[in-house]
């Protein structure tokens, strides 16, 4: 069993978060995603933004964004009530005001946002992963159909009506998925600027989609 589940909490960015077997253990790649999202928001949108985190799990992304961008309004969704219980406990623990929504992807979302961020399940069912992950962490949060691309297409094909005109969509991705996700993004947002960025191991790990933002900094 992973030590984080035994201890019951984990440090993420500046927060300490509760974790159990209903949520994925937050990875440092996801800390890096949050770091980049914060930078892009501050430089291109300003701090009074509305953010939606899809598939929030422990709440690590949503809570850190709220912590670092205190003027933002942050909503976070998950299909798992057990995950939302953990996320709510983390909001309470860190005194952060995030609105949690039970929703299968975008189904129960009613607002519009400047930023949509997601670290969805992206492992293909036939991909080999480490036993400690496969045997302990929630498969609901790990695996996805369509070679791991299912959630990216679901989000991108439906996102437009939940976005304000000027917006950023940010994803964590599997290292071989960058060009496929870029292709899907341009299918639904043909005028967007799409950036694929690498993690600390020099692997494709993040996709950022910018709409109506001309001079991206």
Task: Please describe what each predicted stretch is.
Residues 1-40:
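Conserved AdoMet
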Residues 7, 102-103, 173, 198:
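Short loop/edge segments at beta-strand edges and connector loops
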Residues 17, 98-100, 194:
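Generic structural signal for residues in well-ordered beta-strands
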Residues 25-28, 56, 74, 78, ...:
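Residues at secondary-structure transition points
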Residues 32-126, 130:
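Conserved SAM/SAH cofactor-binding pocket of Class I
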Residues 120-151:
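Mobile active-site "lid"/loop adjacent to the S-adenosyl-L-methionine
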Residues 146-210:
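Conserved Class I SAM-dependent methyltransferase catalytic core
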Residues 213-217:
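Flexible, glycine-/basic-rich loop-and-beta segments that form/coincide
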